[in-house]
A protein has these predicted regions:
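Phosphate-binding site of ATP-dependent enzymes
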Residues: 107, 132-221
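A long amphipathic alpha-helix within ATP-dependent nucleotide-binding catalytic cores
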Residues: 159-163, 206-254
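A conserved helix-loop-beta module that forms one wall/lid of the active-site cleft
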Residues: 47-129, 140-155
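Residue-level marker for the onset of beta-strands and adjacent loop->beta junctions
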Residues: 100, 179-180, 252
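Short beta-turn/strand-loop junction motif enriched in small, turn-promoting residues
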Residues: 97-98, 170-172, 251
Length: 255
């Protein structure tokens, strides 16, 4: 399975190599070509209308210096503290640049290891997982070397030096997988909430407005859950934190 993943990445890098060159010559031209191949309509940067068009405009023209800090799972903690939201941060057990230095013998029974610059660079120890020290070190060292392709215009990734963190394992009271709430904010105001379920099995996404009315046809390539998702009791609090954290940005997704 790992060999297949590695080969897919190699093939992807080869296919996208010309686009990496094009991005250096003309970022606008590069994103226009990739956008058309993916979305099947022309990218309008002069007067963007759709959400996807506006994301490309932000990548090209909105160089907010906070973006790199907020894209890294460790450095974002400082930003959260400065926004006076430090109480919502998960407990940090350890951080460092060398996975060999992780204090394995002193870790709790349950924990999560993350490399800070990728969305899938996670190792979850739920108390029963069979994970060897050598396996953790090997995976983390590989992930630390991962680079983001420049052709996507995501300049904010890779600015901060990636590191390894160990965080507290968070679990739900009913032993179900945690629901992941992502709040889409525009000019510092929450407008939409995405709820991710079954992330590690059959990933599903449901979308709601801030009154918890379901938003149909808002998918991002994943199916809806088909289940009733109750309005969180702390929704107002969740939206207020999202409002405070997104204030410095014209658009932000607060997870």
């Amino acid at each position: 399975e790992q060999v297949r993943v590695d080969m897919n990445n190699i093939t992807k890098n080869i296919i996208l190599f010309p686009f990496n060159i094009l991005y250096k010559i003309s970022p606008e031209a590069d994103l226009k070509v990739l956008f058309y191949l993916k979305q099947h309509y022309k990218l309008n940067l002069k007067n963007p209308k759709t959400y996807n068009e506006k994301l490309q405009w932000i990548k090209l023209y909105n160089k907010n210096p906070l973006m790199p800090k907020c894209c890294d799972k460790y450095t974002v903690r400082e930003f959260v503290e400065k926004q006076e939201c430090g109480e919502i941060l998960n407990d940090l057990i350890w951080e460092g640049f060398k996975p060999e230095d992780i204090p394995f013998d002193n870790l709790p029974k349950k924990y999560v290891i993350k490399v800070t610059h990728g969305s899938t660079f996670n190792i979850i120890q739920n108390g029963t997982a069979k994970i060897s020290r050598d396996e953790v070190i090997e995976k983390c060292n590989k992930w630390l070397k991962a680079k983001f392709l420049p052709c996507y215009g995501e300049w904010f990734y890779g600015v901060e030096r990636p590191r390894v963190i160990v965080e507290k394992f968070i679990e739900s009271a009913d032993d179900e997988q945690l629901r992941d709430y992502k709040v889409f904010c525009f000019n510092g105001e929450p407008k939409m909430v995405r709820v991710d379920t079954d992330r590690f099995t059959k990933h599903k996404m449901d979308f709601f407005d801030c009154n918890w009315e379901r938003i149909p046809n808002a998918g991002m390539g994943y199916p809806v859950s088909g289940r009733k998702i109750e309005k969180p009791e702390c929704l107002a609090e969740l939206l207020e934190y999202a409002r405070r954290l997104s204030k410095p940005f014209i658009h932000a997704r607060v997870d």
